[in-house]
């Protein structure tokens, strides 16, 4: 038998030199690195279970930051290279900073992720009784397929501000002994009329009512006995009355925990991975950032799922104001610092799904296990509502990733004219900063249970880390 290795043909050599040859990360990475990815995602799963809302994500980020030596930001203070600090915006967004050796005039390296996710928010007057069942009226937040959110165990998170100004934290449905809540649905035997509705109306917004109780208060002198009984329970537990719902922010989210998916445990399934998969990886990158050349920031922001409007979203001015305050101490203009800066908009993309392949253009779609995905633009139709990263900046990011052996890919959000979406990249770009979306491909995005690859998640962490180290 001839044991000589077959020599490559001229065509094979030329193809190897000239043509793209993307490979699954599971084939590119060593077993040791795959084990590192798996271990990294254990911490990620814990984060998903702890930080199910934007407020909880900020609380967890602060706890981890302080453990890593970060201090609260002091406006007007002159910071030295290596100093680490954080700024919290209204309890719903956070900026974490590590000062670099170069001056701020050389710009900032920024990773920007969002920590809000689709959910069901309680209305301001949510509590009612109907046919001796007690329910909460909800108003869905973000873009959802409403039918996916019925018959799912839900927990309730948020804050209630009482009439005297006291703030009460609510978190019920997460502990194993807690009750859960649920949006009901009609049985198939009686669903003839429902099944004739168009898919977007299969479940209507006003039908997303959360079932919260059924036992009456034992007093024939009162009406709405079940409602009264539920309110009595809430009063005993939290000290609130019905009018306190007016000044409350309560969010119903899926109650199940993050879990490994697949016989090979290669994926993570959980609520809220858009965009907490990028929030966690960007957070870990800044926490482990030491003595960077350039000043580095991770921003975890709110309101992306509803357009980034509001004073905790990146369509507001809190980020440029923060940079301006920081720059002023060094005699610099904030706008000049921003213009010299670079950002990875840390947001997810849709992973190619072979079961639902029609909306995807396979040559330009991201895939599970092919690494972190760089998305040059998002938007819709003729690239409306997006930042389109320049070839020069894409080339800069490409070179950075390749030099550091990051497993990465490119992807668009589906076919042209097939729909669309947006990220915070457009608002960062509007500040006059170079930016490109870099994130993790997600299956079943915006569903109560989303799926990501452990390899892709780990590569996102490595991608943000090399930006900070550059």
Tell me the role of every PLM-derived stretch.
Residues 1-470:
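N-terminal hydrophobic/helix-forming segments and targeting peptides
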């Amino acid at each position: 038998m001839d044991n000589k290795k077959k020599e490559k043909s001229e065509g094979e050599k030329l193809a190897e030199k000239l043509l793209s040859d993307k490979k699954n990360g599971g084939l590119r990475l060593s077993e040791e690195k795959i084990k590192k990815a798996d271990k990294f995602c254990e911490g990620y799963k814990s984060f998903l279970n702890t930080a199910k809302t934007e407020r909880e994500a900020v609380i967890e980020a602060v706890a981890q930051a302080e453990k890593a030596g970060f201090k609260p930001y002091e406006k007007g203070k002159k910071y030295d290279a290596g100093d680490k600090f954080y700024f919290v915006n209204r309890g719903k967004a956070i900026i974490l900073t590590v000062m670099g050796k170069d001056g701020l005039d050389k710009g900032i390296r920024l990773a920007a992720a969002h920590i809000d996710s689709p959910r069901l928010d309680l209305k301001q007057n949510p509590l009612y009784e109907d046919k001796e069942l007690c329910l909460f009226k909800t108003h869905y937040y973000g873009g959802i397929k409403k039918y996916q959110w019925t018959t799912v165990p839900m927990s309730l998170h948020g804050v209630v501000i009482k009439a005297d100004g006291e703030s009460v934290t609510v978190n019920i449905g997460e502990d194993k002994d807690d009750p859960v809540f649920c949006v009901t649905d009609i049985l198939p035997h009686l669903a003839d009329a429902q099944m004739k509705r168009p898919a977007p109306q299969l479940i209507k917004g006003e039908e997303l009512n959360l079932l919260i109780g059924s036992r009456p208060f034992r007093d024939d002198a009162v009406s709405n006995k079940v409602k009264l009984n539920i309110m009595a329970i809430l009063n005993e537990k939290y000290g609130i009355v019905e009018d306190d719902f007016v000044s409350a922010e309560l969010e119903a989210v899926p109650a199940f925990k993050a879990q490994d998916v697949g016989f090979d445990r290669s994926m993570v399934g959980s609520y809220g991975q858009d965009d907490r998969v990028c929030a966690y990886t960007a957070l870990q990158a800044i926490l482990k950032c030491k003595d960077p050349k350039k000043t580095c920031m991770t921003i975890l922001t709110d309101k992306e799922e509803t357009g980034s409007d509001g004073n905790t979203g990146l369509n507001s001015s809190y980020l440029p104001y923060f940079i301006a305050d920081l720059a002023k101490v060094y005699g610099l203009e904030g706008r000049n610092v921003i213009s010299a800066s670079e950002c990875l908009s840390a947001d997810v993309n849709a992973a190619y799904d072979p079961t639902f392949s029609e909306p995807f253009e396979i040559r330009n779609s991201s895939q599970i296990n092919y690494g972190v995905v760089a998305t040059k633009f998002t938007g819709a139709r003729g690239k409306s509502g997006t930042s389109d990263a320049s070839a020069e900046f894409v080339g800069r990011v490409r070179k950075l990733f390749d030099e550091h052996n990051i497993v990465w890919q490119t992807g668009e959000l589906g076919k042209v004219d097939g729909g669309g979406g947006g990220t915070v990249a457009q608002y960062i770009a509007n500040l006059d900063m170079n930016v490109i979306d870099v994130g993790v491909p997600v299956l079943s995005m915006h569903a109560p249970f989303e799926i990501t690859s452990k390899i892709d998640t780990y590569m996102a962490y490595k991608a943000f880390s090399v930006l900070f180290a550059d």
